[in-house]
Amino acid sequence: MDRTQTLIENIRLFKDIEKNKEIIRNILPVKESFDIIEKNIIIGSEKAYMVFIDGFVKDDIMLRILEALLPIEETEITIGELIHQKIPYIEVETFTDFKLMQKMVLSGAVALLVDGQDQGILIDAREYPVRSPEEPDLEKVTRGSRDGLVETIIFNTALIRRRLRDPNLIFEIKSIGKRSQTDVVIAYLKDFVDNKK
């Protein structure tokens, strides 16, 4: 178990959303990996924060949830009220510790935190990327899963993250080629890479 995992083992959410965001940015590579998305919103009069992995979340469900949350005008709203009255989705639960949040976000759920609340909401709006059952032609002799990559970068990063739910997995996106400006993703495990080069 690495140092970061040990640090979050017993840490519960704070009521201060800025403290929570700081811890989340330490346990998930939000600023380093382009596929981990954070979104700041306002619910009623309170600051709120969402974090999720691009490629796992069903866009239409998230759009409906945001359409339900953004018009809220109540100045004080509890997590219970949000879950039972405002979020139009079935697969919703609360969480109070960062370890569960990290595990669920890396598995594809959306974490929602609201300022002033010491518990958050996990929205299971996952849609795992899937391919047809045929295996790639060139890899018939290899062991393990038979996932093959496709032309879409987000789909490919989600396929990899589905198999490797490690917070140290980083995807960096770059554009290469003078004229083609092709998007290329470099994937690596932060705790194995040689940072000297």
Model-derived features: positions:
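Membrane-embedded alpha-helical signal segments
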Residues: 1-197
